[in-house]
Amino acid sequence: VAALAAYGNAAETMRQTRPECNLAWTTLAGIGHVETRHGRYRGASLNDDGYALPPIIGIQLDGSPGFARIPDTDGGELDGDPEFDRAVGPMQFIPESWRKYGVDANGDGRADPNQIDDAAVSAARLLCENGGDLSVAENWQRAVLAYNASREYVMDVRDSAAAYSVGTTAP
């Protein structure tokens, strides 16, 4: 429930601040589902304050088959890894993207990728900046590719978002 509320809030935030983006909450829900099952990856869950516990830290992005090679960009500050970057939180932000798009959306004075409200609005910012008008299919696809440069990922997000848009459970 916390994740869905965060996606709705993030879409509303974009409607007010970047109405030309036309971001649907279902796109964020699709990404949240594909990335971490809305903060429930590997036994994690969102607490009452919207934090993923235990924190969700992705695999080392060391260029292993199927994964990008991203040498460390933050001295391990965000992801705890001083050698390679790792995606962090329920929306799986890499440190470089978090530095660019991360915002405090829950009003606690701290932008934190492990907090679902912060992560959802930050994801919305990334999508809107990279896609423009997301009601245009090509722009939506470009935005999701900016989130994760994989055609399979785009299709998975599309399928999940479509399921949410008609009120069914994501695949």
Predicted regions and their residues:
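Catalytic glycan-binding domains that act on GlcNAc-containing polysaccharides
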Residues: V1-P171
